[in-house]
Amino acid sequence: MADHYEVLGVERNATPDEIKKAYRRLARELHPDVNPSTEAQERFKLVTHAYDVLSDPQQRQQYDRGGASGFGGGGGADFSGFGDIFETFFGGGGASRGPRSRRERGQDALLRVEVDLDEVVFGAHRDLEVDTAIVCETCDGSCCQPGTAPVPCDICHGTGSIQRSVRSLLGNVMTSSPCGSCRGYGTVIATPCVTCQGQGRVRARRTVPVDIPAGVDTGLRLQMPGSGEAGPAGGPNGDLYLEIKVKHHDVFSRDGDDLLCTLEVSMADAILGAAATIKALDGDIRLELKPGTQSADIVSVKDRGITHLRCSGRGDLRVGIQVVTPTKLDHREKELIKKFAESHKASEPSLARFQQGLFAKLRDRFLNV
């Protein structure tokens, strides 16, 4: 075991005031709020234990008689070792685990984002303004007014806990409970930052650049690690989650990664065949309609649908055909239709499965393509 005087960096004849000053200096340097490294935490425990012994006249006298081991030739025994044994077997009530840090991870945030269907095809970039917690610029997350630092708690001497000897069936054991003065932190913010009131963070609006990948769909959540709220006392940021909602489009709908739409063609074009140019989400597409095209026929265009979310390639564009029957004809046009009907004897109307209009036909055709 290290010599307590060497741990504090004082002479063996140091006065109580010198011991206290040495402890305060080391505590400011090694406290978890200031130095979160594992090595600093171990040294802080040694410094705290050394101060606990040397700041108590009876324990110091006993330590001086017994040497570096901390046990003397007389007087009461130090129960801290037995407390460790008790904690090992019974899971609590033993020695202190050290002060807890004020640094905590910030909360996650959820933001709902609406995107247009054309943005789903290729992805989009957005600069989103969010109301969140950011690190206080005045104290840089230290919680203290600039030029000051947390001071060790005078009640628990920086340990963050109060130890008491209690009598039990197993004899006297040491129990530990959080210090009520410093709330278990081991330090006290004597001069809180006036900007954040000692929280190390403030509420503010900030702009978050977001790249929305192609292929997203309504209900999908995108995770942005470290873009959530800043943690207390300079703690790490939480995550930001973006919940996607795809806006309704007047022309195109979506089936998986395929795009669906309906093209209205005249009866003459359906009979004779024709070429049609349609405006897709990513540019014009020229379609060739075969002679004899029927309502609810499907024309598929490869790789003109939605970009796949987790792999390369795109879905298809599926165009459902609706043949528009003229409702107003003049006398000459009616005569031409009659002559056409006389030369093309149609079969008698026959029953088929009920379908609620063209949209039902298209739906069935789309599903069976």
Swiss-Prot record:
It comes from Leifsonia xyli subsp. xyli (strain CTCB07). A zinc finger (CR-type) spans 123-205. NCBIfam families: DnaJ_bact, PRK10767.1. This is Chaperone protein DnaJ. Keywords: Chaperone, Cytoplasm, DNA replication, Metal-binding, Repeat, Stress response, Zinc, Zinc-finger. GO terms for cellular component: cytoplasm. Binds 2 Zn(2+) ions per monomer. The gene is dnaJ. Belongs to the DnaJ family. Its cofactor is Zn(2+). CXXCXGXG motif repeats lie at residues 136-143, 153-160, 179-186, 193-200. PROSITE patterns: DNAJ_1, DNAJ_2, ZF_CR. One of its GO terms (biological process) is DNA replication. Zn(2+) 1 binds at residues 136, 139, 193, 196.
